[in-house]
Amino acid sequence: MPNLPSEFIEQTRQLMGEAECNALCRALQADEPVSIRTNTGKNAPAPPQAHPVPWTDNGFYLNRRPAFTFDPLFHAGFYYVQEAASMFIAQAVRRYVNRPVVMLDLCAAPGGKSTLVRNCLPQGSLLVANEVMRARSQVLAENLIKWGNPEVIVTNNDPADFSRLEERFDVILTDVPCSGEGMFRKDDRAISEWSSEGVELCWKRQRRIVADIWPCLKQGGILIYSTCTFNREENEDNVAWIASTLGAEVLPVDTETEWGITGNLTGEDFPVYRFLPHHTSGEGLFVAVLRKKPDSEAGNFCFTGENTRREEADGCHAGNGGEWFADGISPSGDSEEEKPASVYSRRTIAETVYTDAAERRGRKAEGFRKGGKGKAMQKGSKVSGVSFPKETEAWIQHAGNFSFRIEDTLAIAIPADYAGFYDELKESLRILHAGITLAELKGKDWMPSHTLAMSTVLCKDAFPQTDLTLAQALSYLRREAIILDSSVPKGYVLVTYRHVPLGFVKNLGNRANNLYPQEWRIRSGYTPEELHPVYENLLELAACSAGSAACPNPLPDSPSA
């Protein structure tokens, strides 16, 4: 690990004092703990021999780091690999959200906090998860599809693109790009790319982001502001700015003393929550919760106007920063041994994170309304002469709660309560995923979608099923050809691992065509000798995945499960 920057050490000493600074620096040189969060929507139980994360119901510390890439349950969305401090966001949501809401996760990739809040939002809530960077928005969509909750929309937009959605969100989470000091021990590049100039760039950009999105928050709505850095400029100073300039009230969150959370370090009289690695078992995190006062004026924003935005973009001299996936691996399965070339995080100060807003606005009308390039959903497009395949409605539970439609060559199901809002979003945003993609038209055949296989409302009995061995499951996840038992019927078959759905194949008898998404496949042909899977000693997993009372160590019921 490289030496910590001397400027960072000095600013930290001034903020925390000599003893705390020294303790923090020692902690940043130590190994980080390994933690996961289980998916209550898929009835995932507590892992055996794991230790609970105290500030969330379904987070657990593991005794050792499994080879997550080679665990089929990881790819099935049965759990998410997430550092423990980040799970505190759920505590804030539970404290202030007790009815169905519309929530925006503005800077959401790779999706850890989105999957977290989706499981603790009340049933009937809608989550809009957004990421500005194109490549990272695809990662976000992948993780949320695997998580399986249908009350989710994924978008790929700059915060300024939400300007038409005035006062439409009850809750907004802004896990803003930052200087990444809290990630120093996870990635050496965070250290080598840190600078005091970068810190200044970040706090200015963070204010621009909050100012852009503030009009979208309802009167009385909740803004959750978070960073993964330690300095006061990006944390307490920005919270004070939001309160004074935008007319916000800073709110408390319930905590326990034994959790080791640190409060405000600047002496100001408002509650904030700092996770410092020498006091809490996790990475660095800062959280503040603010309420938009009813009838408050928007204020004179410091970061509006096209000239200011251009100057901000031109001021990104360092080009530093990166994006760490919280789990150290990409969702497509690149392992610690084979990291992808671009494993950088929204939290740092890469120049590309928030490009010139004027340019984006110019593209929005033409590009975003058309759905843009790639995999964005097309606005109202239909295949001529093709009607909705009614048989697909039987593929999901509670079909009466959904609005069914054809878009391009896809049959999709949108939660009925939010169908109108979805149509409104398509007018101004680039939507990558919404609801459930049930099937795709291939010739004259409606092929069941992988999104359907991952969904928590999949009706498994609508398809023949076959449970794969570990070797077969890894072959399937590598998108290799597999051969099923002769007793398995021909046609579309749902393949499972330990009775948890992995996806579909089309069984031809002599072989099965692998329908796993090409871009999500495990690229590594290497399989470690020791995998140490999360659930290796839990033989009753089949009962858990079916929601049986026989499931050992069940988790508390989730309101959105």
Q: What do these predicted ranges mean?
A:
Residues 127, 223-224:
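A short hydrophobic/small-residue beta-strand
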